[in-house]
């Protein structure tokens, strides 16, 4: 990797710290405000330079579309964080939610996994996602119809199959005993925390 300027190193550290503290990268406006830039455009130019040097990937179309391309040595050593119970209103990757780390290669999944989520309940059993399994999740704020997502509805985090129709989102279970969760985007809060990219049987890691 080409060496970074002091300002680029400062921005990269800010991005890493924001992801560590909140589970998501900062917006351009947040970077500009924290580092004293006059506009978000100045932050964007530095982000482009970091992308050219291979430190980050810029994902178009979203205000937080920044992805680190190189894992820190500590992260490689620790492995993927396992997320247990998620407290209402807290970022899913907040440190207090991490039960432990598993030495799983993120690249064994496509796209690569960013964290593991302990499955609770049997609402997705018909596609082999069972109680106690570890769901490999790729962080993403966007989803296409038919994808299995980790979604936050108001303060509840759930794993369901995503379907959007107009101004409504339906979160479908893969178990006929459960009705779809209907979310009216005009009146309810919904965010996508990530996409399911694989399942690890809990018994495989005892």
Swiss-Prot record:
Q: What is its EC number?
A: 3.4.21.88
DNA-binding residues per UniProt?
Answer: 28-48
Please write the reaction equations for the catalytic activity of this protein.
Hydrolysis of Ala-|-Gly bond in repressor LexA
Keywords of the record, alphabetical order, are: Autocatalytic cleavage, DNA damage, DNA repair, DNA replication, DNA-binding, Hydrolase, Repressor, SOS response, Transcription, Transcription regulation
UniProt enzyme class: hydrolase
Active site location = 123 (for autocatalytic cleavage activity), 160 (for autocatalytic cleavage activity)
Q: What residues does the record give for site: Cleavage? A: 88-89
Q: Name one Pfam family in it.
A: LexA_DNA_bind
Which terms does the UniProt entry file under GO BP? DNA repair; DNA replication; negative regulation of DNA-templated transcription; proteolysis; SOS response
Please name every pair of cysteines joined by a disulfide bond in this record: none
What protein family is recorded? Belongs to the peptidase S24 family.
Self-association state and partner proteins as the record states: Homodimer.
Q: What is this protein's record name?
A: LexA repressor
Q: Which organism is it from?
A: Shewanella piezotolerans (strain WP3 / JCM 13877)
